[in-house]
From Swiss-Prot:
HAMAP family in the record: NAD_kinase (MF_00361)
Originating species: Campylobacter lari (strain RM2100 / D67 / ATCC BAA-1060)
Protein known as: NAD kinase
Listed GO CC annotations: cytoplasm
Keyword annotations from UniProtKB, A to Z: ATP-binding, Cytoplasm, Kinase, NAD, NADP, Nucleotide-binding, Transferase
Location of the protein in the cell: Cytoplasm
Length: 276
């Protein structure tokens, strides 16, 4: 895909990580790489990113695991800056490379030898009296029961009842999020370039409920009982506080920096033992 980084003009790179973890050596290592190119490495405050500050940066680095990357995506999507995920955590499925690969990657990077891949986010629109609140999730929006009663999730499309789900809940996953909670609940693996989203029931009290794949442009209304809404597992929304909830794919896209030879199917094999 078309690159949106001018290598010759890079001046500042933002680094997002959990500062309470022992990553000082990794941070110093990255800073040394960029100093050789007269590039400043700017540490970003994890709890709250200032969008104005992001506008001065050429791209962003997430140093940590998938949770760190998700947190950056949800906070920085409005800045429209490319993101590079460097794994310093456990699984690191979403991150582009391990920390041990960083030095060799940046040698190629500064030769313009990399690629940009784009992915759409989920948009959650909440209505409360005269207010409209928009929230975004990169992986998934999950309705999960909040007590001993079964979750009741009714889904409407164009004001018609689409389906009703009874059980532990319902996962609404983006294509990128298909390999997260969705796959654990029996949902399909979806290539991240696909502009679709998936509805996967969790422990459905039915023998006939199956996951379904829906296209970009569909917007669903959800009416729920006995459950909470979790966005990327990092933010909790109580549906009872809102009059109406709509979910679909957003027009907003995130741009990710990857190695030029990255093979998605090889990542599936290495990280999830796919096909083995």
């Amino acid at each position: 895909m078309k690159k949106c980084i001018n290598i010759e003009k890079i001046q500042k790179i933002g680094l997002f990580c959990r500062l309470n973890t022992n990553l000082n050596k990794q941070i110093d290592f990255l800073r040394a790489i960029f100093l050789q190119k007269n590039i400043e490495l700017v540490l970003l405050e994890q709890e709250k990113i200032n969008l104005k500050d992001l506008q001065e940066l050429d791209f962003l680095i997430s140093l940590g695991g998938d949770g760190t990357l998700l947190s950056l995506c949800r906070q920085a999507y409005q800045a429209k800056k490319p993101i590079l995920g460097i794994n310093a955590g456990n699984l690191g499925f979403l991150t582009a490379l391990s920390f041990n690969e960083a030095e060799s990657f940046f040698k190629d990077f500064f030769k313009n030898d990399f690629k940009i891949e784009k992915a759409k986010m989920l948009q959650i629109t909440l209505y409360k009296k005269n207010k409209i609140i928009k929230k975004f999730a990169f992986n998934d929006a999950v309705f999960s029961r909040d007590n001993a009663l079964m979750a009741n999730v009714e889904v409407f499309f164009e004001n018609k009842l689409f389906n009703a789900y009874y059980g532990d809940g319902l996962i609404i996953a983006s294509s990128s999020g298909s390999t997260a909670y969705n796959i654990s609940a029996g949902g399909p693996i979806v290539h991240p370039w696909s502009e679709i989203f998936v509805l996967t029931p969790v422990c459905s009290h039915s023998l006939t409920q199956r996951p379904i794949v829906l296209p970009y442009g569909f917007e669903l209304e959800l009416k729920v009982e006995h459950c909470l809404l979790y966005l990327d597992g990092q933010e909790v929304v109580d549906p009872k506080e809102y009059d109406k909830i709509l979910i679909g794919l957003s027009k907003k896209e995130l741009s990710f920096i990857h190695k030029k030879n990255r093979d998605y199917f090889q990542v599936l094999k290495e990280k999830l033992n796919w096909g083995k």
